[in-house]
Amino acid sequence: MWMTPKRIRMEVDEALVFRPEWTQRYLVVEPAEGDGALCLVCRRLVASTRERDVRRHYEAEHEFYERFVGDEERAALVERLRQGDMSLAAVLTPEERATRAGLGLCRFLALKGRGWGEGDFVHQCMEVLLREVLPDHVGVLEGIDLSPEITRQRILSIDSNLRSQLFNRARDFKAYSLALDDQAFVAYENYLLVFIRGVGRDLEVQEDLLTIINLTHHFSVGALMSAILEALQTAGLSLQRMVGLTTTHTLRMIGENSGLVSYMREKAVSPNCWNVIHYSGFLHLELLSSYDVDINQIINTISEWVVMIKTRGVRRPEFQPLLTESESEHGERVNGRCLNNWLRRGKTLKLIFSLRKEIEAFLVSVGATTVHFSDKQWLCDFGFLVDIMDYLREISEELQISKVFAAAAFERICTFEGKLSSLQRHMEEVNLTDFPAFSIIVDELKQQFKEDQKIFDPDRYQMVISRLQKDFERHFKDLRFIKKDLELFSNPFSFKPEYAPISVRVELTKLQANTDLWNEYRVKDLGQFYAGLSGEAYPIIKGVAYKVASLFDSNQICDKAFAYLTRNQHTLSQPLTDEHLQALFRVATTEMDPRWDDLVRERNDS
């Protein structure tokens, strides 16, 4: 369930309360100490007490017990499990246990971005360990095959299992949205990652990877459109249930006449579907905005410095924080594109700004040019870039907060737009209070050029802020268009009926007059409230809830994929089929667990 509180300040919280009915449904009990849910079958603690986490553990690990369907049967089963009677459990043979262990290790290798050939190395490590610690158990490794070919096959099997789970859930989606991310790159090829966010009957939201599309093979917008429609058809989804599109703001996505979004919106138009809501500022906001605010190619210059530090200044203690930060993002080996993207982060620029004196001294020591450190205009642009990118970092991090609805995310966007207006006003007044790095540079330049009355031109930076404001206005125009829907969804009891669309006024008036529903609204989170709201009594309001809940409210899943790609760029640059890449990205981004029993059964049947 999704937990957007009903206050003006949206917080991320979830009522982590164990429900007694879960004992029979999922074979778990409330632990004597601490939070979570204790599984009666495997005696493992499910750390979270969200129903979907408890259910996923049950479906992935103990689907065998679904054969006990009657209430009396389930009650008797629970009692026997409480007493420690495991005779009914599906007993795995040694071969099946070895298969399951091999599958689990292959999944772990995929999560860590390790190559197929490293399975053999893991096998050898375990053998050395067991020979020293448990020599009598070395034989268990004989049935675990981690050869490269088997590892590849198992990753594909896990991907197929996860994809089947997604498709089964997709059939029940009341509404869904797509996120189209064309910033994924592997070696020299770009990919379009297509993520789906669907909402079920009980307002339970599912976010997952739908497919990946190789842009080298699908260069035209028409080819991309066909590939996406094929993926939707395979999942059993029609365009009539699509509510929203969130994309990057590249020309391929939002070009006025030839962008993919315009094609998809045209295709989705029908008498029975909602107008598709599109917003393009969520994905890679910090990265893509940096190209608009870097007015003097600052980052290209800094990139040259960092490459020089990595090759000639690696042993210098003053640069260790910078090198450590770089290696934590993408390891010791990094290509130029990864490095450039990393330097476009507010956090990285802030660190480099703090090291600017040390970098200048280093450049002098190796005989490199230091002309930029005496360029007044360049230094001012550098300070301004550091400050504005730090503000973009803040909003980008806020948009990574998941498990809130789009209404909360849009509120954060509006708050940031107010911040931009404040920055614009302060720059016009030559008030650098909100520009700490810029202020430091200006103070230093005033000391250096005491006779110069004009250190910088505020109009230059006002234009940048103004351009950023217009970009945000354009990116989130559709969310403003449905602002009333978002407000109605977030605050149904305080929303004035006269401001609501005519079609919903009768339902809204009836809802606000219902004391029982008001009491539920006060004590439940927003997702639980709408899940319990009668679709027969309030069909239009329930429809609005499905619509809003299906909109992407964060960039978390896309950032998770991008971080996985960046961190494992060297491994993913090896020759891999698109099928294997899709499997790796799905394993890395999904919240679902594979159904291990099904995978073991398929392995035995093959």
Swiss-Prot record:
Phosphoserine PTM positions read 147
Keyword Endoplasmic reticulum among UniProt keywords: yes
Instruction: Show the GO MF annotations.
Output: identical protein binding
Record-linked InterPro entries: SPIN-DOC_Znf-C2H2
UniProt keyword terms in alphabetical order: Endoplasmic reticulum, Phosphoprotein
Q: Which Gene Ontology BP terms does the record give?
A: glycogen biosynthetic process; positive regulation of glycogen biosynthetic process; response to insulin
Q: What are the record's GO terms for cellular component?
A: cytoplasm; cytoplasmic side of endoplasmic reticulum membrane; nucleus
Q: Where in the cell is it found?
A: Endoplasmic reticulum
Principal location: endoplasmic reticulum
Question: Self-association or partners: how does it assemble?
Answer: Interacts with EPM2A.
The protein's name is EPM2A-interacting protein 1
